[in-house]
Every structure is written in C-alpha cells, then in structure tokens.
C-alpha cells in the first residue's frame, strides 16, 4: 500500500509535463525498489501516460540515502516545488527542511490537497529556485523601504573605505559624495 501511495505521488508530478522532475528520496531500499516496480504498473493506466512516461524516463529519480537526515539534506539540495514528508514524525524533522516551495507534512497530505483545496497558494518556486526564493505570499504585495542612518563620526570612520570602493569602480562622484562631507 505504501509503495502505491508513493508511486501515485511521483505520478502526480510526472503527469504535469514532460519536463517535470518526479523524485523520490528515501532511506529504504525496499521502498525504492517497490516504487520503481509500481511506476511500471501505474503509468500506463494514466490518460496522460505518454507525458508521465517521458517525465519519469528523462527527469525522474529515486535517490536512496543512508538515513533520514541524509535524505533531508538531499531534499534541501534539490529544493523541490512540492515536498511530501511521509515519515512517522514529520514535525520532528520539519526544522531540518530549509529549501522547498510547499511542504506537505505526513502521509495524509497529498499534493492535490494543497493544489486544489487547502493550500495557502499554488504559486511556488520551481526548478530548484526554492533554495533562494519563497512561495508567493503577502510580502510580495507589501511595499517596503529600507532605512539607513549614520552619525557624522560613524561615517567618518568608514569614509576612506567607501571612497576607495567607489574609485575602484570608476565612480568618482560616488567617492566625492562621501569625502566632500569632510572637506574644509
């Protein structure tokens, strides 16, 4: 039953398009083997079997890790758009997960639940960009400004370095904008 569930998870990624990257990361050799066999049974049953087959053949991976923590490290490197954490205690490993667009915790949270019903949104970083990007959120619609304040003394301490940086870049007016404040 578990390999069928895991296989369906991979299929649901594979049927998106030929460029999809269905990946299973596990620390169980038995599960990896069972999912591989189950994919061969289930893919032909899909209406979009040709797309799913191409996706699995060209971009699909089953990554076998020595332990759960290595599996999480692999997931952080992959930085998937969707990450289904199907372990006994998903909340126990949540703090280790740093790079995923949307994280589905537990065996009762299929991707379709997040896509169509309960997810916070479906605009997620793809192609590993979850390493440096976040899902679309409220912060994307809030205008912000940054603020900077230095005292005359604090600026004086760093002014020579700033001027040096600016001159090395060939931006002499930038350098002068700092040094002019200290001319007599």
Residue ranges and their predicted role:
Residues 1, 19-21:
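Structured catalytic cores of enzymes that bind and process phosphorylated ligands/cofactors
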Residues 1-8:
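Short, small-residue-biased leader/transition segments that mark boundaries at the very start
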Residues 9, 34-38, 116-118:
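Short acidic, glycine/serine/threonine-rich loops at helix termini
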Residues 11-17:
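Active-site donor-nucleotide binding/catalytic segment of nucleotide-sugar enzymes
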Residues 16, 24-100:
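A glycine- and small/hydrophobic-rich beta-loop-beta segment
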Residues 23, 27, 31, 63, ...:
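Catalytic cores of large soluble enzymes that bind and process phosphate-bearing ligands
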Residues 77-184:
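C-terminal core of ALDH-fold dehydrogenases
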């Amino acid at each position: 039953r578990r390999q069928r569930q895991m296989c369906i998870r991979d299929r649901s990624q594979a049927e998106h398009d030929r460029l999809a990257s269905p990946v299973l990361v596990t620390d169980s050799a038995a599960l990896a083997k069972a999912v591989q066999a189950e994919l061969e049974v289930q893919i032909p049953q899909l209406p979009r079997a040709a797309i799913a087959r191409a996706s699995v053949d060209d971009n699909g991976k089953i990554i076998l890790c020595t332990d759960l923590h290595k599996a999480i490290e692999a997931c952080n490197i992959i930085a998937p758009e969707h990450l289904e954490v199907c372990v006994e205690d998903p909340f126990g490993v949540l703090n280790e997960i740093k790079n995923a667009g949307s994280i589905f915790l537990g065996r009762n949270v299929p991707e379709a639940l997040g896509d169509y019903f309960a997810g916070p949104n479906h605009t997620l970083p793809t192609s590993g960009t979850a390493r440096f990007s976040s899902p679309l959120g409220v912060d994307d619609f809030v205008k912000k400004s940054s603020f900077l304040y230095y005292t005359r003394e604090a600026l004086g301490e760093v002014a020579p370095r700033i001027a040096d940086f600016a001159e090395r870049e060939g931006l002499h007016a930038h350098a002068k904008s700092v040094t002019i404040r200290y001319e007599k």
